[in-house]
Regions:
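Active-site-proximal loop/turn and secondary-structure-junction residues that shape catalytic pockets
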Residues: 85-87, 119-121, 144-146, 183-187, ...
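N-terminal pre-triad scaffold of radical SAM enzymes
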Residues: 6-54, 70-83, 136, 211
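Distinct, well-ordered alpha-helical segments
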Residues: 91-99, 123-131, 191
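Acidic (Asp/Glu)-rich catalytic clusters
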Residues: 69-74, 102-108, 128-135, 168-173, ...
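Core AdoMet radical
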Residues: 49-93, 105-122, 135-163, 210-212
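Auxiliary Fe-S-binding modules of radical SAM enzymes
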Residues: 2-22, 216-317
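Structural recognition of alpha->loop->beta junctions
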Residues: 133-136, 194-212, 273-294
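Conserved C-terminal portion of the radical SAM core fold
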Residues: 161-222, 240-256
Length: 317
């Protein structure tokens, strides 16, 4: 009989140090994923994070934050706090924990905080609370500018106008907005997904300070995983990500999580590491020149596949 997994509610899911783009330059950042009760919406077709939820109290979350900050140093100027849901949702991040975390970050002199939230939790009050403590970047999972795709393929539960309204609320109080865009939602062909990502990036540009291109990967216990197991979904080609990055004016960043694996974005296996590394380098430099020179024999396969899909399914996006 399998042992039941015991979760330590006073330790974060994970924490790591990395480089982050800040004011056009590379900066040392600390990223933590806190274990909360999980996303209240919990219906997105590609998201498996809800399975990581647990009944963490405000004191548990403060302890998780303290544990994560042990990895920090004076070099860290950016702190990113992710909850697999919405930092601004009081049902997920109790006000007591939120306010204590903000107070401590302010005392440490952190230059920028990045949090994730759905647009319905972005209010003048919640933005002011964050901005009063330290400059905050509010990351919103827009995924696509198409309401049709967002509702039917992703089941996100809000509209493009909801995103615009939240963005305006943030900007009125001097905050920054990051828009997450999803490359290859389920039900779209490779070419459709690539064109939608480019169109979405251009539409979101007027409302976001920075764009983040997220390459769809296959997470467990999701609709996307069930489609993938039936052979109905393939994660995006890394070539498609390159085309989006080359086609959209910056700043736009991308971290190809799971690149080169069956469940993650991949090409043929031979060029995956080189292309993924070029994408990560571009996130810090915003220089598209290195992306132009990448090549592999599988690139023609990618092109032919998209042409075949267009002949089979047509151009609907």
């Amino acid at each position: 009989m399998a042992k039941e997994r015991v979760l330590d509610l006073r330790r974060p899911v994970t924490v790591w140090r990395s480089q982050d783009l800040q004011d056009g330059r590379s900066a040392e950042s600390l990223t933590m994923i806190l274990r909360t009760v999980g996303c209240r919406w919990n219906r997105c077709t590609m998201c498996g994070y809800a399975g990581e939820g647990a009944p963490a109290s405000a004191l548990d979350l403060i302890a998780q934050f303290e544990c994560a900050m042990e990895r920090s140093s004076t070099d860290v100027s950016v702190v990113k706090i992710y909850t697999s849901g919405s930092f601004l949702d009081p049902a997920e991040m109790p006000v007591q924990a939120r306010d204590e975390i903000l107070k401590r970050l302010k005392a440490l002199g952190i230059k920028k905080l990045v949090i994730e939230t759905r647009p319905e939790y972005v209010t003048p009050q919640t933005v002011e609370i964050c901005q009063t403590c330290l400059p905050t970047e509010f990351a919103i999972g827009l995924e696509t500018a198409s309401d049709l795709i967002r509702e039917n393929a992703i089941k996100k539960g809000f509209t493009f106008q909801d995103f615009v309204n939240a963005s305006e609320t943030v900007h009125r109080q001097g905050g920054r907005v990051k828009a997450y865009l999803l490359l290859k939602p389920p039900l779209l062909t490779e070419g459709q997904a690539m064109r939608d990502a480019i169109a979405s990036a251009r539409a979101a540009r007027d409302h976001a300070d920075i764009l983040s291109l997220n390459l769809c990967n296959v997470q467990r216990n999701t609709m996307v995983e069930r489609m993938w197991e039936r052979g109905e979904f393939r994660p995006p080609w890394l070539w498609s990500a390159l085309e989006v990055l080359k086609s959209v004016p910056g700043p736009i960043v991308c971290d190809p999580v799971g690149a080169g694996t069956r469940r993650g974005p991949h090409n043929c296996g031979e060029c995956d590491d080189a292309v993924a590394e070029a994408i990560r380098t571009h996130a810090l430099s915003q220089d598209v020149a290195p992306l132009q020179s990448l090549d592999c024999q599988c690139k023609s396969t990618w092109t032919e596949l998209m042409e075949l899909e267009e002949q089979s399914f047509g151009n609907i996006v």
